[in-house]
Amino acid sequence: MTVIRLTRMGRNKKPFYRIVVTDSRKRRDSGWIESIGYFNPVVEPKVLKIDEERYNYWLSVGAKPSEKVKKLASK
């Protein structure tokens, strides 16, 4: 099954997340199909960028967003 989830980037105590489309059986940070955005919770204000067109495309073909991605995308 295809999922949309966060993958952690950055360094110790300075996380930065990519919003990626991947297979649900893969590990969190392993290979992904497509990167559709990013989320940076460290800076003020928090930065979120999602390619809405690609996000909606992946939802239309059956990808399931994680709870956190769902929450972020609704903002």
From Swiss-Prot:
Record InterPro entries: Ribosomal_bS16, Ribosomal_bS16_CS, Ribosomal_bS16_dom_sf
GO function terms (MF aspect): structural constituent of ribosome
SUPFAM superfamilies: Ribosomal protein S16
Species name: Aliarcobacter butzleri (strain RM4018) (Arcobacter butzleri)
Coiled-coil positions: none
A biological-process GO annotation: translation
PROSITE patterns: RIBOSOMAL_S16
Keyword Phosphoprotein: no
GO CC terms in record: cytoplasm; small ribosomal subunit
Homology family: Belongs to the bacterial ribosomal protein bS16 family.
Name used for this protein in its record: Small ribosomal subunit protein bS16
Keyword list, A-Z: Ribonucleoprotein, Ribosomal protein
